[in-house]
């Protein structure tokens, strides 16, 4: 685990701790990617993660280490479709903690679509890209941020759930030689 999990000395009495006899986290990843370049530049992937001795902060902001492994599976894909100067890029991810799901809250589904127009301008001296991105992820009780620890802690019983609604952003970016301009309106919906 990182040093922040091992020991903390604070003026706030509730934030003084020392994690006794910690074990090293062991992360094992098995997975692969299949690319189908002929079909809209598409790729699919599958990943499986096994994390032994997973270290986390509980809802009381105290470091803990899991006695059993945390197993996570992910299946997803990405595809890009081009038609003239219009581009459509979509990405999906299905993920699930197979056990100890309360130790690492996460959305079961994450999706993103990016529709943009890309062209050259000013006698081909500039590249311009303008578009809209839409994100969505399923509702889940997210971990809470502790500014005293500068870490995320497990959600409390009264935790606020996030997700379950789309988020849309609009943007325009331009590159002229070595200079980049980027303007984005986030969460316009």
For the regions a protein language model found, what residue spans apply to each?
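Exposed, low-structure sequence patches enriched in small/polar residues
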Residues: 1-189
């Amino acid at each position: 685990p990182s040093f922040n999990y091992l020991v903390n000395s604070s003026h706030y009495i509730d934030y003084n701790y020392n994690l006794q006899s910690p074990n090293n986290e062991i992360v094992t990843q098995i997975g692969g990617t299949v690319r189908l370049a002929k079909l809209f530049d598409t790729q699919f992937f599958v990943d499986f993660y096994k994390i032994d001795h997973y270290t986390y902060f509980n809802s009381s902001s105290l470091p803990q280490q899991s006695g059993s492994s945390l197993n996570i599976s992910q299946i997803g894909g990405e595809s890009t479709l081009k038609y003239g100067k219009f581009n459509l890029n979509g990405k999906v991810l299905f993920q699930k903690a197979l056990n100890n799901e309360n130790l690492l809250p996460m959305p079961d589904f994450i999706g993103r679509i990016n529709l943009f127009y890309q062209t050259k301008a000013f006698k081909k001296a500039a590249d311009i890209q303008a578009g809209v991105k839409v994100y969505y992820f399923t509702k889940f009780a997210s971990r809470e941020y502790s500014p005293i620890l500068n870490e995320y802690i497990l959600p409390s019983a009264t935790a606020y759930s996030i997700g379950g609604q789309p988020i849309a952003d609009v943007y325009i970016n331009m590159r002229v030689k070595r200079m980049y301009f980027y303007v984005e309106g986030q969460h316009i919906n």
